[in-house]
Amino acid sequence: RGLGDVYKRQAYAARKFGAPAIVVMPTTTPLLKVNRTKELGAEVVLHGNVYDEACEKAKELAAEHGYTFVHPFDDLEVATGQGSIAMEIVKELPTVDTILVPVGGGGLSTGVSTLAKMLNPKIKVIGVEPAGANCLQESLKAGHPVTLENVNTIADGTAVKTPGETIFPYLQENLDDVITIEDDELIVAFLDILENHKMLVENSGLLTVAALKHLKPEGKKVVSILSGGNMDIITLASVVQNGLIQRSRIFTVSVLLPDVPGQLNKVSKVIADVQGN
């Protein structure tokens, strides 16, 4: 799942058991995710530009104050819990051929791929990550976890430099493939899912929708896991605007006009004649 869901999950669990929670997030985290986590009773610390830097800060705070550090994805118990999604999929669709799962640090993909293969080894499980944060793809090529120099993607919930070291062997064994998605593809997928299915899914959760165009799903039973709907209004407006531009539904027109009355009226008539607005 996207990191926004991880933050909220840990804050909720801490409140449920009456324990204080400190959640460390990158400074680039959308305000919606920050506020939702605070609403669940957690103290939020903003540090670093990417998840990996925030994680190191959380480890420092845990060591300094004697807190219990809970890793958002590099933990087998966390991955096992997320793997229950595979159990739900197989229960509802026993004949599923392929499962597409978003990849950030690898917790969700570890759980889903491992549980799916245990239930039916013939199921293909494909991880999908942003092209600008393809740490798992590069790590699988290298045969060990590698750290990207930088990440650059609008899918902030999966913007991770290094996949989990503990869970990496499970990913090597159980993932059949990894597909990477460009930001432009995510923008188009966002518009598709919003207009055609009336669903608001954040960019990280849309990775598996965009991945469908990289496959040939005809005649196959393919499940795309949509994880996360944590998108603030400013990001939403920007993605919609860019999506409409890519779909050629919004144009920017620049013209040089004589400084005489009636010129704007002529431009408006030209636009109206082609059913523009």
Residue positions per predicted region:
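Small/polar-residue-rich loop-to-helix segments that shape phosphate-bearing ligand pockets
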Residues: 22-98, 129-180, 185-186
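Alpha-helix C-terminal capping segments
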Residues: 8-20, 111-120, 210-218
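Glycine-rich ThDP/TPP pyrophosphate-binding loop and its adjacent helix/strand module
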Residues: 89-122
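Short, small-residue-biased leader/transition segments that mark boundaries at the very start
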Residues: 2-7
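Residues at the starts of beta-strands that form the adenosine-phosphate
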Residues: 20-21, 43, 122-124, 221
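A conserved regulatory-domain signal marking ACT and ACT-like small-molecule sensing domains
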Residues: 236-277
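Catalytic phosphate/nucleotide-handling subdomain of diverse soluble enzymes
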Residues: 213-242
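Active-site-adjacent helical/loop segments in soluble small-molecule enzymes
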Residues: 164-220
